[in-house]
Swiss-Prot record:
Molecular function GO terms recorded: nucleic acid binding
Pfam family, one: UPF0102
InterPro entries linked: Restrct_endonuc-II-like, tRNA_endonuc-like_dom_sf, UPF0102_YraN-like
Recorded superkingdom: Bacteria
Name the record gives this protein: UPF0102 protein BURPS1106A_3900
Species in which this protein is naturally found: Burkholderia pseudomallei (strain 1106a)
Family per record: Belongs to the UPF0102 family.
Amino acid sequence: MCHAREASPGTGEPEAAPRDNFPRAAGSKRGVGAAFETRAQRFLERAGLALVARNVTVRGGEIDLVMRERDGTLVFVEVRARANSRYGGAAASIGARKRMRLLLAAHAFWARTGGANACRFDVVAFEGSRLVWLRDAFRADDAG
């Protein structure tokens, strides 16, 4: 019974366990992600950035946070969390394919808002309980 949970109330049938074998409430992955995004947003606001948009979804990608620096620079933020830093940690989990999707989404957002401001790509990574802010984590010309 390694890959089954206790019997469901009322049915007596065991529920299938998640693939990674760690139990979690239904929909909690999205809730956990939202909680980390909120923590990242608050951190960046305390650092002087202003929220422009959150969870921007365009064809081909999603941007967790769009912030604005005091000088007007748009900051596209990817929020990542990992329980520990094995396998390179949270920031290392943003591969070339993810960077390309972020670039496409950012370009669409930037163009839709007039395209006049400078922009950059930051990563806020949570490694266990530690927050790491990687300013200018990657550039459009090194995304591939």
